[in-house]
Amino acid sequence: SYAIIENDELRHRFQTYMEASEFSEGHLFAYLSVAAAYSHGTEWLDQVVAYIKGNVDFTETYLKEHIPAIKMIRPQASYLIFLDCRALGLNQEELNRLFVEDAHLALNDGTTFGKEGEGFMRLNVACPRVTLEKALKQLEQAVMDLK
C-alpha cells in the first residue's frame, strides 16, 4: 500500500516512521501492480464494487427474513456493516460470546469504537457470497439457540 500526504510536516513524520520500521521499501512487483491497477483496473473495480453491494443487499434481506432481531446499518462507503444487536437484550460480553463461541464468528466488537458501540458488531462483507451465507446461517442458529 502507499500513502499520499499533502502536508509536508506530516509526510516527513510518516516517512521517518516507515523508515524506522523498515516498511519504506517497496519491491518491483508492488510498483508494477499499482501502475497496472490504475491503468487497467477500472473494469475489475466496478465488478468488485457491484459484488460487494450485492453482499450488502443479501445481508440486509437475510437478516430481515431470518434474524429480524438484528438490524443492519447500511455502509456508505465501505464493506463493513454495523449489526445492531441491541434487541437481543445481551450485554457486550454476552454478545461477544454469542458471536465467537456460539456462532463461531470473529467480528469486530462495536465497543472498539467507543461506548456508543455497545450492542453492535461489525461484519465484513467483502468475501465470497458462500462464505457470507455460511456466517449468517451460523449466526441465525446461535440466535435461535438463545430462546
Spell out what each predicted region is.
Residues 98-107, 113-147:
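PLP-dependent enzyme catalytic core of the Aspartate aminotransferase-like
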